Amino acid sequence: MSPNTLSLLDAIKQRSSLHVVSDDVSISDARIQEIVREGILHAPSPFNCQAGRAVVLLKEDHKKFWDIAHDASKASVPPPAFEKAFEPRIKMFRAAYGTILFYESQDALEKIGSKVPMVKAAMPQWSEHSSGMLQYAVWTMLCAEGLGVSLQHYSPFVDAPAAKQWNIPADWSLKAQMVFGKPTGPRLQEKTFEPVEDRMKVFGA
């Protein structure tokens, strides 16, 4: 089923974490950029502040990011943990085709806080909600294209060196890193579901 005929519910069900991927993708760079662009344009944000930001790293820039993650993590994590957990996973992510860095503009958030002081204290939390929706939208669209995708969090190790490498504006706060490529292996862990009845309440129906 193509992305054009996939229903929204089917796309939501299809979305999952796939970590074992390669850089041998059939999707065009233009299509990847279109997906991220549409996500940024249409994902909701508090008071329509449009604070969501993204940096798309492909091919060698993608690999450079994971080289940065390797060196930054090695310098910050105890050697046993780095060698057992960090290094193998970073190597796995480096083998992918691309990484999307998701940011939130602190200037955009502070602008709303200045205009509407009563919501200023809530803006950081709402910003996290907004960024999560942007990440989810892009993740779902990439999976609908047949890509394997996973969401990673290597902050704060990578924040400063990545900002320096790609000249990221100072007010952009890094939230997550989305790795994608051609699926080449099974999920590291199959999806399981707790009973919905224990997680949902309905009144008045």
Question: Model-found features: residue ranges?
Answer:
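Short, hinge-like loop/turn segments at secondary-structure boundaries
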Residues: 72-73, 167-170
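Short, surface-exposed, charged loop/turn segments at secondary-structure junctions
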Residues: 70-71, 113-122, 192-193
